[in-house]
Amino acid sequence: MIMKRFWLISMLLIGSQLRGNACAHDVTYNYYLFHTWAEPENYYLRAADASEWDNHNSDRVHQFWCDYMGKKCNYLYDRDEIEERAKQKGDKEVLDYMKLLDEYMAVSEIINHESWEYPTKEELAESKTKCRKLFAAAQNYQGTRLKPQYALLQMRANMVMDQHQANVEYWEKTGSKQPKSVFREMMENIYAGALFHTGQREKACDIFARQGDSESIQWALRKYRNVAGIRRIYADNPNSHSLYYLVDEFVNDVQETIDGQNIFHDWDNESKLDAEGLKAKRLFFSEVDAFIQLVDQVVAEGKTKDPLMWVTARGMVNYEVGRQSAAQQDMERAAKLKGREKSQDVYRCVNMLIMTANPQMSSSKMLEELTWLRDKAKKDIQSGHDYDGYHHRAIQRVVLIGLAKRYHDQGNHTMENSLHGFYQNLVYTSERTNDDAETSDWNENYSGEYFYGLDTLTAAQLVKYYDELLRPHSDPLEKMIVESVPANPDYFNDLIGTKYLADGKIEQAASYLEKVPAKFYEGLNVSYYLAHRDYHKERWMVQQRSKKDVEGINKGRFTQNPKLAFCQEVLKLQDTYKKAKPGLVRYQTAYKLGTMIFQASSAGECWPLSRYGKSYGTDFEGHFDSKTGNWSNYDALGVMARSYLEESAKSADFDLRVRSLYGLAYMPFDNWADAEYHWNNGNGFYTYTPNRNSLQYAALKKLNQCVKGSANPTPAYVTKCDVLKKFRKYQ
């Protein structure tokens, strides 16, 4: 372990000049395909952030205390309880160890590289004095139960005292003979740091690499993370393990830089770049070309035992900078070269990504490779490192960026959507059916990019997509991908019917929803709302409160399809409405329709009839711009409900007319006024500037005129309306 570590910025990423961070926007899948230096079981450590090595060991150290206490605990938080237990047991051995451990932790807190302030000379001197005493106490331990812990304490104390040569000797004579444990691994990590401080960088980096300690190797090789540095390490030892790390970093820096530019498109037009940006771009490409020349030199000299790694790196770099033909030639060349097993894995993954950009991509070859990668990714998931396993991350980038982009550019949206389904099905490892969902508290069929992609489609597009899933596919790759996406008829009929319902096409919605059984809706995450919300109640009159635990499956029971029942009732009322002449029956029917349909809109309390989720704080998806007269995020049901209330507001019946106008005034299509907050003499208050062209303003104006111009007593709900009171003051 190296005491001082800093966050490093590659010369390829020149901060403000490039402005790109490929991890700074949604859904990039910017996972590094080029990983050759970490051991397979530590891929997840390399893929995660640099502190994962410490976190990984910390969890295993805490396990010692969990075993001692017989329950889950953490020494940092449960120290007093552990001490009390040791006292109860009369366990002097553990109590003595805890005392020394606390002393070391106190010293470590002072010199820790993450401390807010650097320690003073006096604090450093005092820390070394304490560590000399700590070392002596640990050295005098005569027991066996805590021997690994005391051995680790000795090496930690030496590390603080800068006794690096002593740590080298202690490990080689004593520490290395300890049985395998987390404490032995931590001792070896300190040994590697000692090797580095005594001039044995090569051996130190080999250990850091084997352990997956990216933070330490990053510090140890900080001066070599460019082509010139790679060339120097290669000249010293053509087969140095450090080269795997450095080549990885170079290739991945290229990938991250290009991904960042793909977001901002800064490099597409050099005329848009300032002088610094242009300089950065040219420096970047000069480094890329220098790296390619170095690869050619390495392979030509024949000194490396892993030419496959080098040429694969060349191909990945060429691919990232847009030299697709050169990248394909590199992959053809690499296929004939030898390399370690890890390099072979990386070659196959990189080759797959490059294949996706080839107009003549072999579908059968891609199928073969994707099947191999899928099986590898499954093992990642089963290992428990489902989001950090190398092959899992590789399949994300190959499938969701490489192949998905290919089919998007071809206009093949069936394959583009199905690839997301293929990946999601791989992760969740269950079929897309609501029966399967019953084993969980949450139905994953309604989350994830695959569902979100389907949810953006129109009803007609969903119909087409579902038909495409069902038809035979002759292309072997397309056949495998499409068939991996479960085409549950209940799921898709509900999706399509719900889309039509949201569009206000009630009859078409019913034709699909009538195919879906009632029990299906018990498996929806919105089952509670569907079962317990009443769309006959006026949203502007009644607030339907819910219990706390309302989200997830099996929160409601159904004897009939709730969406179909809604559609059938609306269709029946619409038939009555169409046949009725202007008069009370027509207006009452219009009011019922306006009430029901508004409840099913995004602003209603029965919104799960027309959608599967809703953002908190979002009252209404539709908005009317009174200045332009245009709609944005059009909500067909909300607009339809308004038209029915406008009709019922024509009624001569005072109560019906007032209720209709009150409902219109409630609808949040726009705001009747702009509110401005003021603060004066310790008091806060609002003033309102009316938007006289807004729909809500017009509704409030009509409501006000109606109740003021009538001899009928004003209903209490109108009298108490705060919004109407403000309207009367500021109109």
Where would I find each of the regions flagged by the language model?
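Hydrophobic alpha-helical segments, especially transmembrane helices
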Residues: R5-F6, G20
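Extracytoplasmic/secretory-pathway proteins
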Residues: G20-R156, M161-Q731
